[in-house]
Amino acid sequence: MIIGIGIDIVELERIEQLMMKNEKFIDRILTEEEKRIFFQLSPKRKVEFLAGRFAAKEAYAKAIGTGIGKNVSFHDIQIMNDDNGKPIVVSNGKDCRIHVSISHSRDYAIAQVIIERLS
């Protein structure tokens, strides 16, 4: 049974401007493990990665019904990749399955999250 759906879209240019304007923006959005991956990427790929993670975390927060705010921060949500490269939300929730999709175009990154109750 689906218990939550969230979607978010961001402009790559906006994320790039925020990265250049404020060094702490990266620290605010990414967890330590996500940053390890981020800093190994090319400049273009860094923007796509950060924008995709930003959108996925926003989508997840919408799917759980809170949005990003006082109850859920960007650091409470970690988006990694499985062995096949598929994005996954690292979560302690054992009674639900979380589906994540991230896509990029020339100008945008978009992410959708669906939370499914297993029992």
Swiss-Prot record:
Top-rank EC class of the record's enzyme: transferase
Key words of the record: Cytoplasm, Fatty acid biosynthesis, Fatty acid metabolism, Lipid biosynthesis, Lipid metabolism, Magnesium, Metal-binding, Transferase
Chief place of localization: cytoplasm
Amino-acid positions noted as binding Mg(2+) in the UniProt annotation, renumbered to this chain: D8, E58
EC number: 2.7.8.7
InterPro entries: 4-PPantetheinyl_Trfase_dom, 4-PPantetheinyl_Trfase_dom_sf, ACPS, P-Pant_transferase_sf, Ppantetheine-prot_Trfase_dom
Annotated Gene Ontology cellular component terms: cytosol
Keyword Cytoplasm set for record: yes
CC cofactor: Mg(2+)
Molecular function in Gene Ontology: holo-[acyl-carrier-protein] synthase activity; magnesium ion binding
Catalyzed reactions per annotation: apo-[ACP] + CoA = holo-[ACP] + adenosine 3',5'-bisphosphate + H(+)
Disulfide bonds: none
Entry keyword Transmembrane helix: no
Gene Ontology BP, a term: lysine biosynthetic process via aminoadipic acid
Subcellular location: Cytoplasm
Function: Transfers the 4'-phosphopantetheine moiety from coenzyme A to a Ser of acyl-carrier-protein.
Family recorded in the similarity comment: Belongs to the P-Pant transferase superfamily. AcpS family.
UniProt protein name: Holo-[acyl-carrier-protein] synthase
